[in-house]
Amino acid sequence: MNGSLSQHDQERLSTPYRDGPPEETVYLVTGASRGIGRGLIEAFLQRPKSTVVAWLRNVRTATPALSALTVAEGSRMIIVQLNSDSETDAQAAVQTLREEHGVTHLDVVVANAAMATNFGPASTMPLEHLQAHMMVNMYAPVLLFQATRLMLQQSKQQAKFVLIGAPISTITNMHDYSRAPLTAYGVSKLAANYMVRKFHFENKWLTAFIIDPGHVQTDMGDQGARLMGRPQAPTTVADSVAGICARIDEATKETTSGHFVIHTDGSQLPW
């Protein structure tokens, strides 16, 4: 979904706390080497007194570009390896945060890493493609929450677990995306939505929700656009990231948790 941000959202992007944060805010983003993930790392680093944890697959190749990002006063970035197709990397990465970097809590965790590589009809989709998508798009966010849950509970702010979702995963609106040959991607994101909503109900202390980032000009987004006969996706990474940050900042347990919200204005998508 494309759309421009309100002036209010743009003003809030770099100043989420008008009176200053109560303490250092710790953000964690997966899939941080490019696209939306990299954009979120850049945005969070511009906030004072922030620790921004970038979890990504290839630390060696991604570090030079990430290290060149502007860092606000009192802020820092930590880069940790995480393979989303691993069942053990999330726990190991949390241990690295604690033991090597002295991180004792997390305030915001963004499950952004995803894959979309199979583009055929559901009727002939090979099972191995579905399994691969379920591992990265559903199992990995579950493993991420399980690994970070205790550190989120240590937050002195309102702990937030955020899944970057996709409107193609909604059952109600499936007719709008019926031509898209993205069955494995859609059903794996749908399963992830269920789990995040389940986290909301099971954890009264947690704000857990899904954000539709728009159809974004990333490698994955542009590839999807071409499959639909369009030259590129309509939403820039900058606009998507600004909206995502605004929705995270304003999210509360009462108004946002357990819902699937649109990045531009926070309105809810149907399941």
UniProtKB/Swiss-Prot annotation:
**EC identifiers of the protein:** 1.1.1.349
The conditions that induce or repress this protein are given as:
Expression is stimulated by gluscoe. The promoter contains a CRE1 element (5'-TGACATAA-3') required for cAMP-mediated stimulation of expression. Expression is also positively regulated by the cluster-specific transcription factor aflR that binds to an AFLR1 element (5'-TCGGCCAGCGA-3'). The promoter also contains an aflD-specific element called NorL (residues -210 to -238) and required for full transcription. Natural plant compounds carvacrol (CR) and trans-cinnamaldehyde (TC) strongly reduce the expression. Zataria multiflora essential oil reduces gene expression.
CDD domains, per database record: carb_red_sniffer_like_SDR_c
- Record-linked InterPro entries: Fungal_SecMetab_SDRs, NAD(P)-bd_dom_sf, SDR_fam
- Which GO terms label this protein's molecular function in UniProt? norsolorinic acid ketoreductase activity; oxidoreductase activity, acting on the CH-OH group of donors, NAD or NADP as acceptor
Listed A to Z, the keywords are: Cytoplasm, NADP, Oxidoreductase, Vacuole
What superkingdom does the record give?
A: Eukaryota
Q: Where in the cell is it found?
A: Cytoplasm, Cytosol; Vacuole
Q: Name one GO cellular component term.
A: vacuolar lumen
According to its UniProt record, this protein's enzyme class is: oxidoreductase
Quote the protein name from its UniProt record: Norsolorinic acid ketoreductase
Please state the pathway this protein functions in, per its UniProt record: Mycotoxin biosynthesis; aflatoxin biosynthesis
Q: What happens when the gene is disrupted?
A: Leads to accumulation of norsolorinic acid and a substantial reduced production of aflatoxin AFB1.
Identify the catalytic residues: Y185 (proton donor), K189 (lowers pka of active site tyr)
Q: Which reaction does it catalyse?
A: (1'S)-averantin + NADP(+) = norsolorinic acid + NADPH + H(+)
* Residues the record lists as binding NADP(+): I36, N112, Y185, K189, V216, T218
Q: What does this protein do?
A: Norsolorinic acid ketoreductase; part of the gene cluster that mediates the biosynthesis of aflatoxins, a group of polyketide-derived furanocoumarins, and part of the most toxic and carcinogenic compounds among the known mycotoxins. The four major aflatoxins produced by A.parasiticus are aflatoxin B1 (AFB1), aflatoxin B2 (AFB2), aflatoxin G1 (AFG1) and aflatoxin G2 (AFG2). Within the aflatoxin pathway, the norsolorinic acid ketoreductase aflD performs the second step by catalyzing the dehydration of norsolorinic acid (NOR) to form (1'S)-averantin (AVN).
Biological process terms in GO annotation: aflatoxin biosynthetic process
